[in-house]
Structure formats: C-alpha cells, structure tokens
Amino acid sequence: MFAVIKTGGKQYRVVANQVLKVEKIVGNAGDVVNFSDVLMVGEGDNAIIGAPIVADASVTAEIIGQERARKVISFKKRRRQNSKRTRGHRQEITTLRIVEILTGGLKTKTATVKSNEKKAAAPKEVKADSVKETATKTVKKRNVSQKVEAASESKKD
C-alpha cells in the first residue's frame, strides 16, 4: 500500500517502513508524527484520489533525526562593477520512517512517544510569616538652590 502525503510545500509518495527526508518538522528523535494531508492512497491497481484530500486517511511516521542539508552557495556577480556577493544556506531537514498508512477511519495504534519534558512540580505554598516586607526609603526632592549648596559643600571638604 502506498500514499501521497503533503508536507513542507512538497508531495511525497510513501510506503510503510520507508525512510525519507523532508522539510523541518518540530520534534525530537523518537517522536511520532501524524500526517492527515493524504492526497492519494493506493494498493496495486486500486487507487483513491482525494479532492483535495482523502477523507479519514492518515500516515504515521517516526522522527529518526534532525539534521542540516548540504550547503547551497548563492553567488552574484555584476560584471564591470567590481561587485560580487557570496552567500551560503543550509536547509534544516528531518529524517522520517513511515510506520503505517491508515485508511477508512481506522484508529491509530497507541504509539509510545519519548518526551524529555519534565512534569512541573506543584508550586509550594509560602507562609505569610516567612515573607519579609521590603523597606522603602523616601527621598526628599531638592530644588536647584539646595543642589548648588550641596555641591559647594562637597567641594569645600
């Protein structure tokens, strides 16, 4: 069975256990990703073409790793202008392994998702006695003549 999925502005023909590289998908290695934008599903001569997507079809994939593609050099030269510019770009890509292709509204198998998220501990209650009040210092505003007097006194010392 094969499927045509849409991700990252491109279309990919995939089969089960296929490894492919796509535009970056947020996630860590071991995470499971579900693609619901299935444009076509087929097996042998039988094919179901969506308009634009196939209803109740999905493709489940596992993220193998995150990496960067080879550097693409962009070079511009303006002749007789003594002007040139070289730039490089490395696109971030995700390597996926297709786990299963589901059609007809079948439920996905419960997949174990490895997550590095730590559960947030409940905030501790703070007793009112332990909270200290901050001391506030009030400063009296001085006018210009007082500032001049204070400056002249500091020079005398």
Swiss-Prot record:
Region described as Disordered: 112-157
InterPro entries named in the record: bL21-like, bL21-like_sf, Ribosomal_bL21
Transmembrane domains' residue ranges: none
GO biological process, one term: translation
Keywords from the UniProt entry: Ribonucleoprotein, Ribosomal protein, RNA-binding, rRNA-binding
Highest taxon, organism lineage: Bacteria
GO CC annotations on file: cytoplasm; ribonucleoprotein complex; ribosome
MF-aspect GO terms: rRNA binding; structural constituent of ribosome
Compositional bias of kind Basic and acidic residues: 115-135
Family: Belongs to the bacterial ribosomal protein bL21 family.
Subunit structure: Part of the 50S ribosomal subunit. Contacts protein L20.
General function of this protein: This protein binds to 23S rRNA in the presence of protein L20.
Protein name as it appears in the record: Large ribosomal subunit protein bL21
Organism field: Bartonella bacilliformis (strain ATCC 35685 / KC583 / Herrer 020/F12,63)
Source lineage: Bacteria, Pseudomonadati, Pseudomonadota, Alphaproteobacteria, Hyphomicrobiales
Gene name per UniProt: rplU
